[in-house]
Regions:
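A residue-level marker of the well-folded mature domains of exported/periplasmic proteins
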Residues: 3-13, 24-281
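Hydrophobic core of alpha-helical transmembrane segments in multi-pass integral membrane proteins
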Residues: 18-23
Length: 281
């Protein structure tokens, strides 16, 4: 009886996820006087560091489109530096110095690994304001931010729990840091809420963006376990392609890929960065 009731709510859960574009962001301010900053006309040049392509149908593209939409609304110019490795402090320094030379007085770093490099750059340029997405360390001119994505993760877990026929659900994750573990926990709690018999199988790639590794890990998961739905925490949508090729459904992340996977993407936890960037810039 209980499972039947949850089955009737399936469409409602999907609709809620579709409407839940994450705009309730967690933002830790390092005592930035934003009103004073906005008096400076140089603010209209904004710099952005991205660790890969802006056309990944995932994490980076979601940020890029958010910045572009915010720029149109605010009339600012966005200066991008792409393919800046987030584990290379010298590359971060060089890209940051280039952005500063172009007149940027706000610089956004959109990958977790930029932390150490951004802190060092901020120490050298106290007049510049830095914003680190998914970061953990602040400074007088460095703030960190992220969103309450665990809310959408929980709902997508409910959708997976209602949809699975095998009671085996996969989750391919990048690395065991707080934001990833929090998402896995929320997703699993959502699954268990509607289907206590279902099991979530987690596999790690130890990388945000390594397509071949993601493909290998996902294929092995689907071969070893009777998984019929796969979720993920990776930068791109590569996993959705693998799931589709192997006859499983996928739960997307970061970006709306319904047009690309109309029959096999069950739902997605999607970012709407425009709202946040429009407010912050």
């Amino acid at each position: 009886m209980q499972k039947s009731w949850w089955s009737k709510q399936y469409g409602i859960i999907i609709a809620i996820i579709a409407l839940l574009m994450i705009t309730a962001f967690l933002y830790k301010d390092s005592l930035l006087d934003t009103e004073k900053v906005h008096e400076d006309e140089r603010l209209y040049n904004v710099g952005v560091l991205i660790d890969s392509t802006i056309y990944d149908a995932g994490w980076n593209q979601a940020h890029y489109e958010g910045f572009e939409e915010a720029a149109k609304e605010l009339g600012v110019k966005i200066h991008y530096r792409t393919f800046v490795p987030d584990n290379d402090n010298e590359a971060i320094r060089i890209a940051g110095e280039e952005l500063i030379a172009e007149g940027c007085r706000e610089i956004f770093a959109t990958s977790f690994g930029y932390g150490e490099g951004i802190i060092k750059l901020a120490q050298q340029h106290p007049e510049i304001y830095f914003f680190h997405c998914a970061g953990t360390e602040t400074a007088p001119n460095v703030s960190v931010y992220f969103g309450r994505m665990y809310q959408a993760r929980y709902l997508s877990g409910m959708a997976a729990g209602m949809r699975t026929k095998t009671n085996h659900i996969g989750f391919v994750a990048a690395m065991p840091i707080v934001e990833v573990i929090r998402g896995i926990n929320a997703f699993t709690l959502g699954v268990q809420k509607v289907n206590p018999q279902a099991v979530v199988h987690v596999r790690w790639t130890d990388s945000w963006d390594t397509p071949e590794k993601e493909k290998e890990v996902t294929q092995k998961l689907l071969e070893d376990v009777p998984v019929d739905i796969v979720a993920y925490h990776q930068n791109s949508s590569q996993l959705l392609e693998v799931a589709q090729a192997m006859g499983a459904e996928g739960i997307g992340y970061h970006y709306d890929n319904r047009e690309k996977f109309p029959d096999t993407m069950l739902t997605a936890a999607v970012w709407d960065w425009k709202q946040f960037y429009t407010k912050l810039i």
